[in-house]
Amino acid sequence: MLKQVIVVEGKSDIQRIAQAVEADCIATEGFTLRKGVIDMIRVAYEKRGIIILTDPDTAGERIRRVLTKKFPNAQHAFVPRDEAFANDDIGIEQASPESIRRALSTLHVESLESSNEFSMVDLVRHGLSGMPDSATRRAIIGAKLGIGYGNGKQFLYRLNHYGITRDAFEEAVNS
C-alpha cells in the first residue's frame, strides 16, 4: 500500500490504478475542483502526501497546474501520452497497469526555484525544439526522464524544476 494518496481525474482512473497498485485515490471529477474535493486533497496532502497523476492531455495539465499551486510539495507522476491512448481516448484509464507502476516509480517534486541547468539552447542542440520531429523527441525523452510530454517551454520548465540532472538528461538523449 502506497503511503501517499494518488490524485486522479475520474472514477475510471481510480479503477485502473487499483489494477496496478494498492493505493488510496481521490478523483478531482474534472477541472472545476469543487471545494469538498480540494478539502479532501488538503487533508491527504497534510497527513500522507499526495501524488498527482493526471491525464497527459490539456485538461490534465491544467488540473496539475492548479493542484501544484495549492499543494507545492506534491509529488508528480507522468504516464507518457503514447502509453495512455486507446480507443480514440487519452487518459490514465487507458494506460496499462505496468505503465502506471512505471510512472509511480519515477516521482518528482516541483521545486519553486529553477535550477537554470538547462536552456532553450540545450533543447535546440538535441533536436527537442525547432525541428519537425521535436514534439516526438520530447515525448520520448520526457518518458525516459519520467517528466511527461510538454511543448518546448513546458519541457524546459520541467527539466529545471523537477530535479533533472545534466547526466540524466544526456543519458536519456543519447540512449
Spell out what each predicted region is.
Residues 8, 28, 58:
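Short glycine/serine/threonine-biased micro-segments
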